[in-house]
């Protein structure tokens, strides 16, 4: 019998494998100075990097500057990619270093409303939008209350969609530590939201 879920899982795996091959090929071309490959790489990874950086900085203009710095670092360092991690986790690790360099001495903030307004989605009515904004404000406030390490980890796993292994590679810590920190972050976030009468 033909299981559609099994086939869709196989297709998703094949797509991910094809994407990884495409990314490695793009990096090879970028290392040779191919501007079209760099543009394709930016289209593929720019929004994910922007979302991750925005989660940490909370400032759209600053986040866009950091994305530009990150892509410049990719342009200059494409030949240094050794394939020990996924391309996505490699570029996010670069963005993480760029963000850390830019934020030295600055307070971290959460996602800004301008970023949220730019996100695609359905067009709910004004009442639903008002409730969604209120709930979102509660979650944003709760995330702001987390330790920076927890905010960053939540951003990597849920914001950027990295696997636990990829997040571990980016953070340069064992997968077990990622799991325990993620559990602690979820617990802390739930605690903060429960204190405010919300839950995840």
Each language-model region and where it sits:
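Sigma70-family region 2
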Residues: 31-32, 55, 60, 69-86, ...
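Internal acidic/polar
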Residues: 4-12, 19-23, 108-136
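Short, Lys/Arg-enriched C-terminal cap helix and immediately downstream tail that follows
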Residues: 2, 53, 82, 104-107, ...
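Short helix-capping/turn signature of helix-turn-helix
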Residues: 43-47, 55-58, 155-163
């Amino acid at each position: 019998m033909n299981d559609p879920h099994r086939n869709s899982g196989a297709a998703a795996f094949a797509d991910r494998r094809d994407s990884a091959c495409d990314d490695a090929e793009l990096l090879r071309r970028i290392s040779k100075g191919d501007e079209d490959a760099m543009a394709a790489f930016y289209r593929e990874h720019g929004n994910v990097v922007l979302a991750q950086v925005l989660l940490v900085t909370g400032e759209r203009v600053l986040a866009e500057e950091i994305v530009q710095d990150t892509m410049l670092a990719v342009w200059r360092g494409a030949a240094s990619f050794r394939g020990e991690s996924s391309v996505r986790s490699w570029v996010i690790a670069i963005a993480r270093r760029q963000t850390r360099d830019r934020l030295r001495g600055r307070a971290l903030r959460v996602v800004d409303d301008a970023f949220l307004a730019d996100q695609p989605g359905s067009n709910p009515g004004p009442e639903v939008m008002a409730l969604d904004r209120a709930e979102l404000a509660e979650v944003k406030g709760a995330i702001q209350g987390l330790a920076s390490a927890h905010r960053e980890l939540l951003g990597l796993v849920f914001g950027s969609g990295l696997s636990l292994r990829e997040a571990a590679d980016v953070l340069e810590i064992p997968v077990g530590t990622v799991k325990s920190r993620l559990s602690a972050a979820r617990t802390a976030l739930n605690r903060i939201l429960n204190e405010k009468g919300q839950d995840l």
